[in-house]
């Protein structure tokens, strides 16, 4: 649990005149570094136009919908790489969007293509698909089919970018 003192220290730090020249990215980075979450804004807010263009759902909306495949967006909070018993690499990525914090698995093929870009604080557009329901009908695993940096999309003319 975060103490009121810690939050007050963060607020004081953000109001300090030495931080007035900080970019939005720097402020968000310091918030996340200090608190473990974003308090003044969220990095995905900078990409609202792109998210609308691709009809991106929040993770919570996708999770609760009957739709099996969708675009979602997320900002990386942490990356933990692991190996399967067969030696294949995979990563458990903790993401944050405007609805919640969630974890997704990136398996070796997708991980190998994107490892160098998976940095805390970076935001991504993900194509996700719900796996078949398990036998007890309790949950459906959500798999990442494709992941693209939102910075990369915005540097291109995103109207012409195709995400498969």
Spans of features found by a protein language model:
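Noncatalytic, beta-rich nucleic-acid-contacting surfaces in large DNA/RNA-processing enzymes
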Residues: 1-164
